[in-house]
């Protein structure tokens, strides 16, 4: 399924049905009086977060969503039928923005969370409502209230426990493929990953979700490369995993490039808990490993771990370090498979 994390949508709630002008007409009843019914309410437009979706691709093929209008009232005091609501089903983690793309109208972060986007119009009163002591036969009724037209933006920010960061070709997708059932595209050229990938990782009977976003380059926050538009997907992460390519010519510069982009992007990304890892150590000897780790620790001011996604050396230790930094309430117990009773 193709990935889409931003969509423009046009919505309209239903108009209310018109009230009815009608009079009771029966045999032997000369002055029956008014009996016009009210119009039905127009349908409303809602957005609801549902499970099982991680893209807004459906909104590329349908951008217009119009709720039903209410049915006009009828004689014999019959009210019109209400218009049916329409529900936009979106992935968990979807932000709903106003037309200016800045004002946040709602943030759907839980399954089943629902928000009203456009309320349907009220139905008009029939002429029965206007009967009074001085006006026994009113010939007026109210029109239904008009529906609401508006344009909104849907912006998806994936909800994951860990966000994978690094320059292009730092080995992020290789790490995700080695630790989960996710199968991102892996190749020996920059920007192999063109959209975020999610993988469920298990360690010590606990599972958590890792998001792999396209690699960042210097100036990404100004629109260079493709990574800056995906940084929003790691805003919700509890911890960031920063992979530094051990085969790079200047890994300290690589480290500062990513940190600089986090600071320039804002949103407190640079202040999130972070695990820094020297990757691709399968290509380094012991002396090179020690030298590069010391360089990175000096640059980062904190501990640096080592691993190789290709050979899986050090991967388990990195996963345990991530688990220790994720809030306990965000971790899920790994389901234990029930053993089947032996049968001959």
UniProtKB/Swiss-Prot annotation:
Keyword Transmembrane helix attributed: no
Domain of life from the UniProt record: Bacteria
GO biological process, alphabetically ordered: ribosome biogenesis
Sequence ranges assigned to domain Obg in this UniProt record: 1-159
SUPFAM superfamilies xrefs: Obg GTP-binding protein N-terminal domain, P-loop containing nucleoside triphosphate hydrolases
UniProt main location, coarse: cytoplasm
Enzyme Commission code(s) on record: 3.6.5.-
NCBIfam families tied to this protein: Obg_CgtA, PRK12297.1, PRK12299.1, small_GTP
Subunit structure: Monomer.
The name this protein goes by in its record: GTPase Obg
Species name: Ruegeria pomeroyi (strain ATCC 700808 / DSM 15171 / DSS-3)
Lineage per the UniProt record: Bacteria, Pseudomonadati, Pseudomonadota, Alphaproteobacteria, Rhodobacterales
């Amino acid at each position: 399924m193709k990935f889409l994390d931003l969509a423009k949508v046009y919505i309209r709630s239903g108009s209310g049905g018109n009230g009815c002008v009608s009079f009771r007409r029966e045999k032997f009843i000369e002055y029956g009086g008014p009996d016009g019914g009210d119009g039905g309410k127009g349908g409303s437009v809602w957005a609801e977060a549902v499970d099982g979706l991680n893209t807004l691709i459906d909104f590329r093929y349908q951008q217009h969503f119009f709720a039903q209008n209410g049915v006009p009232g009828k004689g014999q005091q019959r009210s019109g039928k209400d218009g049916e609501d329409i529900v936009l089903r979106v992935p968990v983690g979807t932000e709903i923005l106003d037309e200016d793309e800045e004002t946040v109208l709602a943030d759907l972060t839980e399954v089943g969370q629902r928000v009203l986007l456009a309320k349907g119009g009220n139905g008009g009163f029939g002429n029965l409502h206007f009967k009074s002591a001085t006006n026994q036969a009113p010939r007026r009724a109210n029109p239904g209230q008009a529906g609401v037209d508006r344009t909104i933006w849907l912006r998806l920010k994936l909800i994951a426990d860990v966000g994978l960061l690094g320059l292009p070709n730092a080995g992020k997708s290789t790490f995700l493929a080695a630790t989960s059932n996710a199968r991102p595209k892996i190749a020996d050229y920059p920007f192999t990953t063109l959209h975020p990938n999610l993988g469920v990782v298990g360690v010590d009977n606990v599972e958590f979700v890792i998001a792999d976003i396209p690699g960042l380059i210097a100036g990404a926050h100004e629109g260079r490369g493709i990574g800056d538009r995906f940084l929003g997907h790691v805003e919700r992460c509890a911890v960031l995993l920063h992979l530094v390519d051990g085969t790079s010519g200047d890994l300290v510069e690589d480290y500062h490039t990513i940190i600089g982009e986090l600071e320039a992007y804002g949103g407190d990304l640079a202040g999130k808990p972070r695990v820094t890892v020297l990757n691709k150590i399968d290509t380094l000897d012991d002396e090179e490993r020690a030298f590069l780790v010391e360089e990175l620790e000096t640059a980062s001011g904190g501990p640096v771990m080592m691993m190789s996604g290709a050979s899986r050396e050090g991967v388990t230790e990195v996963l345990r370090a991530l688990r220790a930094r994720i809030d306990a309430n965000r971790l899920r117990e790994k389901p234990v498979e029930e053993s089947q009773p032996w049968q001959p």
